[in-house]
């Protein structure tokens, strides 16, 4: 299983822009941009916690498990 970040989707649902998210969470704009462009980006739990707090969701709502491409090809 791989873990995919759902930050972009949750922020859109909440109507929060990348700029507002980076300022409110005190996370660099570069990191937010990377998370938005690469949902498999390996960020820290501290960053996820900050983003979750600003978005008003538990940190677990910002991630989801998806099958690895290797697992898909073996089935």
Where are these regions (language model features)?
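A short, Lys/Arg-rich alpha-helix, primarily the initiator
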Residues: 1-15, 19
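Short, basic-rich loop-to-helix N-cap that marks the start of a DNA-contacting helix
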Residues: 39-53
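Residues that mark the N-terminal boundary/hinge immediately upstream of a DNA-recognition element
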Residues: 6, 17, 44-47, 58
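Short, charged recognition helix plus adjacent turn
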Residues: 63-75
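DNA major-groove recognition helix of helix-turn-helix
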Residues: 11, 25, 36, 66
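Alpha-helical DNA-recognition elements
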Residues: 34, 38, 50, 68
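Short alpha-helical DNA-recognition segment
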Residues: 16-34
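The alpha-helix within a helix-turn-helix
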Residues: 11, 22, 52
């Amino acid at each position: 299983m791989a873990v995919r970040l759902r930050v972009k989707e949750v922020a859109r649902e909440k109507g929060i822009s990348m700029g507002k998210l980076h300022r409110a969470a005190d996370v660099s704009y570069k990191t937010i941009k990377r998370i938005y462009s690469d949902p498999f980006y390996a960020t820290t739990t501290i960053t996820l916690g900050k983003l979750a707090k600003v978005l008003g969701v538990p940190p677990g709502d910002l991630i989801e498990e998806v099958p690895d491409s290797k697992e898909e090809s073996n089935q």
